[in-house]
């Protein structure tokens, strides 16, 4: 079982699309895209994803990817 990274389709246009594309290439991650993750207020502010159900955001796609990997490393479950 790999870490689950969930993206909101509405947030992809806010900058998380590039992060999703980078993470999709990592065979050690399960990357999913959903219609809405119910984080509407935060969704409009910055790129974000849920990592194993926990909210992780960044100022841009590059920072989001860095923070996702840092979160996974700090919270190793597998």
Curated annotation (Swiss-Prot):
<protein>
    <recommendedName>
        <fullName>UPF0349 protein BPUM_2879</fullName>
    </recommendedName>
</protein>
<dbReference type="InterPro" id="IPR009910">
    <property type="entry name" value="DUF1450"/>
</dbReference>
<comment type="similarity">
    <text>Belongs to the UPF0349 family.</text>
</comment>
<dbReference type="Pfam" id="PF07293">
    <property type="entry name" value="DUF1450"/>
</dbReference>
<dbReference type="InterPro" id="IPR022916">
    <property type="entry name" value="UPF0349"/>
</dbReference>
């Amino acid at each position: 079982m790999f870490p689950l990274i969930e993206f909101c389709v509405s947030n992809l246009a806010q900058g998380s699309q590039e992060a999703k594309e980078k993470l999709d290439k990592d065979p050690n991650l399960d990357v999913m895209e959903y219609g809405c993750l119910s984080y509407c207020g935060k969704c409009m502010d910055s790129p974000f994803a849920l990592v194993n159900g926990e909210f992780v955001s960044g100022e841009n796609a590059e920072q989001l990817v860095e923070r996702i990997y840092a979160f996974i490393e700090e919270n190793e479950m597998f």
